Amino acid sequence: MGNFGLFVRFTLREGAGEAFDALVRETAAGIRAHEPGTLVYACHEVEGAPNERVFFELYADHAAFEEHERQPHTRHFLTERDKYVEKTEVDRLQPYTGKYPTGAEK
């Protein structure tokens, strides 16, 4: 089975950006340190939309995503994010072509 990805859009509560971004930085540090199956975990501010954040996540496979979801830093993020987020939209992605990091299937 090939790679598995997510595109996630968060609409933040007014004034919550700084605290949300700090939570994300803490979570990303755990991902970098403990998740070899998480190939990309890219978090972005949206130009012209200060209360929007988008994440692109790419996993080696669905099992790597499930392992990501079990990690303490991810569980902490999922518990704490509701303090800062009004709305979350998630698209599950099945990559089929493009330029990917070393180790990712096409």
Residue ranges of model-derived segments:
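Glycine-rich beta-strand-turn "strand-cap" elements at beta-sheet edges
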Residues: 2, 42-51, 77-106
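Short, well-ordered beta-strand segments in beta-rich or mixed alpha/beta enzyme
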Residues: 3-11, 40-70
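N-terminal first-folded block
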Residues: 4-34, 38-43
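Short alpha-helical
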Residues: 15, 26, 50, 72, ...
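An amphipathic, aromatic/His-enriched active-site/gating alpha helix that lines ligand/cofactor pockets
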Residues: 26-39, 58-92
